Design a protein with these regions (language model features):
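Short, flexible helix-loop junctions that flank or precede catalytic/ligand sites
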Residues: 1-196
Length: 196
């Protein structure tokens, strides 16, 4: 609360673990401050549900929130020993299914002989692991007027996710698969960090 008296433009709250912290963040946002915070959840949509479960008022909360960014770090394919390979049909089908068949069609290539994915062979640079460094995968949920209405109605996670995707949100898994197609990481890594 002392920060509010100092009239900052931006406030960073370390982590929201309880109702009191969440209420202060909402109050600060409603009085014109840009508030950033962290919370441990599996997805952007689950963040909304978690904060409502803490006891936040859904009307003030939905008015205060601009968006939610979920992020995970995947191991990056080692650039020194990265090699191209042609995926099997079952590997390809697994990517399509995880991405969402309806979302995949028209945006990504059909299975063909020229389709290429990448993996690390293993070298001295990466200690024979095939990975070196990290690559982030993201999920950004922007709060639209229709999303605010769902939050105020305390909608279920599935309803929030459906609306967020129709508003253009790309899920963690979808962003991870985009990084796989770009040759930055592997689907095994995306599965490990983004699929529960």
């Amino acid at each position: 609360r002392a920060f509010l008296r100092a009239d900052p433009d931006v406030i960073m709250i370390g982590e929201m673990r309880d109702k009191e912290t969440a209420d202060i963040a909402i109050e600060a946002s409603l009085t014109g401050h840009l508030v950033f915070s962290t919370i441990h959840t599996n997805s952007a949509v689950e963040t909304v549900v978690r904060l409502l479960d803490l006891g936040c008022d859904p009307f003030n909360f939905s008015d205060a929130m601009l968006g939610v960014l979920a992020m995970r770090l995947c191991k990056r394919i080692c650039p020194n020993c990265r090699e191209a390979y042609h995926p099997t049909r079952s590997e390809y089908d697994e990517l399509v299914q995880a991405f969402g068949e309806g979302d995949w069609e028209g945006v990504h290539p059909a299975y063909n002989p020229g389709l290429t994915l990448f993996r690390g062979r293993g070298c001295d640079t990466c200690n024979q692991t095939g990975y070196r460094g990290r690559v982030p995968i993201h999920e950004l949920m922007v709060v639209s007027d229709s999303m605010k209405a769902l939050i105020q109605a305390r909608a279920r996670t599935g309803e929030l996710l459906t609306l967020a995707k129709s508003d253009g949100m790309r899920t963690l898994v979808q962003d991870g698969i985009e990084k796989v197609l770009q040759g930055l990481t592997t689907y095994k890594q995306v599965r490990a960090v983004a699929i529960k």
